[in-house]
From Swiss-Prot:
GO terms for cellular component: cytoplasm. GO terms for molecular function: cysteine desulfurase activity; pyridoxal phosphate binding; selenocysteine lyase activity. Homodimer. Interacts with SufE and the SufBCD complex composed of SufB, SufC and SufD. The interaction with SufE is required to mediate the direct transfer of the sulfur atom from the S-sulfanylcysteine. It comes from Pectobacterium atrosepticum (strain SCRI 1043 / ATCC BAA-672). The active site is at residue 364. The gene is sufS. The lineage of its organism: Bacteria, Pseudomonadati, Pseudomonadota, Gammaproteobacteria, Enterobacterales. Pathway: Cofactor biosynthesis; iron-sulfur cluster biosynthesis. It is found in: Cytoplasm. The keyword Lyase applies. This is Cysteine desulfurase. InterPro entries: Aminotrans_V_dom (IPR000192), Aminotrans_V_PyrdxlP_BS (IPR020578), Cys_dSase_SufS (IPR010970), Cysteine_dSase (IPR016454), PyrdxlP-dep_Trfase (IPR015424), PyrdxlP-dep_Trfase_major (IPR015421), PyrdxlP-dep_Trfase_small (IPR015422). Keywords: Cytoplasm, Lyase, Pyridoxal phosphate, Transferase.
Length: 407
């Protein structure tokens, strides 16, 4: 059975838009994916007919909203094969999830003189929180470098690991290069050295199945808006014994069991101890609908379709003169490039005139830009709704820019 691309595209209302008098070719899903009708409708339905404050409400609407929220927690656990829904913490997104781990686990279990390892290809969200921890607590940040082909130089990992390595934080798929890192093997190496491992799944979650138990990672983080869900909602997966040992990062309502001005605070169990205040319940409902959508479409089918589309795109882009591609031969979801000596901003601006949306800049990965000696790159990204015709339009647009501007 062939991939139902026309039906899929019909599910996403914004794809019918025009930009600058041209049909929209949305090639910026790595930044944020479009939303299907089912996600938009589920969030709207919740606010129209089901909304109430969750937790401890005595009335029916509150109890139902709480049950619906916890049902999505169960759904997330199933989606990534967590051992328990109590290993799922709702956060605003990947960035907050990493900051939570850095501030709760990091400030408790990583001591002055210890070290942690990140990689040269990380998004700033998986660099800056660890640098802040290092500055505040005298922790060393070690960096696993890139190899020449755009993959990680994983042979250097055993060199970086030692008895004082407390954590490895690594992206599963690079948001710039599309590199699929061998995280399962890296996790095993790090854990053998006594370190815990955080996997940034912001890019991988939309392109392939994720099984946190098979990976044996300690933490896994992702954002809802990358997987066709709402903005402002994300997930921190953490092994239950680790979450239970970690102190809360933020204080307030919902994360306590008892508060006394005389005897102090008793915190709730995880995951609720990490969910202070009123949650984004509408976003949580939309996230659940997004996971339903991806599951119904079939994650293996998505992976096969996008892999075929990537090969088509890479072959088609060879027709563009003076195009430099960055990253490994085999990549997932994103294609980073520059056209001649032209600034990425200029290339992206011309493509926008043609109705083609890409991302330009440093992609929150300045160390990666420094590695390649460029200030910025263009990035086109694929999703469940991307077509070969859109790739053809990208190629034609780049050829047109080259004719207009030269090298």
């Amino acid at each position: 059975m062939s991939y139902p691309i026309e039906r899929v595209r019909a599910d996403f209302p914004l794809l019918a838009s025009e930009v600058n008098g041209q049909p929209l070719a949305y090639l910026d899903s790595a930044a944020s994916a479009q939303k299907p009708h089912s996600v938009i409708d589920r969030e709207a339905e919740f606010y129209r007919h089901e909304y109430a404050a969750v937790h401890r409400g005595i009335h029916t609407l509150s109890a139902q909203a709480t049950s619906a929220m916890e049902a999505v927690r169960e759904k997330v656990a199933s989606f990534i094969n967590a051992a328990s829904a109590e290993e799922i913490v709702f956060v605003r997104g990947t960035t907050e999830a990493i900051n939570l781990v850095a501030n709760s686990y990091g400030r408790t279990f990583i001591q002055p003189g210890d070290n942690l390892i990140i990689t040269e290809m990380e998004h700033h969200a998986n660099i800056v929180p660890w640098q802040m921890l290092a500055e505040a607590h005298g922790v060393e940040v070690r960096v696993l470098p890139l190899a020449e082909d755009g993959s990680l130089d994983v042979a250097q990992l055993p060199v970086l690991l030692d008895e004082r390595t407390r954590l490895l934080a690594v992206t599963q798929i690079s948001n710039v290069l599309g590199t699929l890192n061998p995280v399962k093997a890296m996790i095993a190496q790090a854990k053998a050295a006594g370190a815990v491992v955080l996997i940034d799944g912001a890019q991988s979650i939309m392109h392939q199945p994720v099984d946190v138990q098979d990976l044996d990672c300690d933490f896994f983080v992702f954002s809802g808006h990358k997987i066709y869900g709402p903005s402002g909602i994300g997930v921190l997966y953490g092994k239950r014994d680790l979450l239970q040992a970690m102190p809360p990062w933020e204080g307030g309502g919902a994360m306590i069991r008892q508060v006394s001005l005389r005897t102090g605070i008793t915190y709730a169990d995880s995951p609720w101890r990490f969910e202070a205040g009123s949650p984004n319940t509408g976003g949580i409902m939309g996230l659940g609908a997004a996971l339903d959508y991806v599951t119904a479409l079939g994650r293996e089918d998505i992976q096969r379709y996008e892999s075929s589309l990537m090969q088509y795109a890479l072959e088609a882009l060879t027709q563009v003169p003076d195009l430099t591609l960055y990253g490994p031969a085999e990549r997932h979801g994103v294609i980073a490039f520059n056209l001649g000596q032209h600034h990425a901003y200029d290339v992206g601006s011309f493509l926008d005139r043609y109705g083609i949306a890409i991302r330009t800049g440093h992609h929150c990965a300045m160390p990666l830009m420094e590695h390649y000696g460029v200030p910025s790159m263009c990035r086109a990204s694929l999703a469940v709704y991307t077509t070969r015709e859109e790739i053809d339009r990208l190629v034609a647009g780049l050829q047109r820019i080259h004719r207009l501007l030269g090298s």
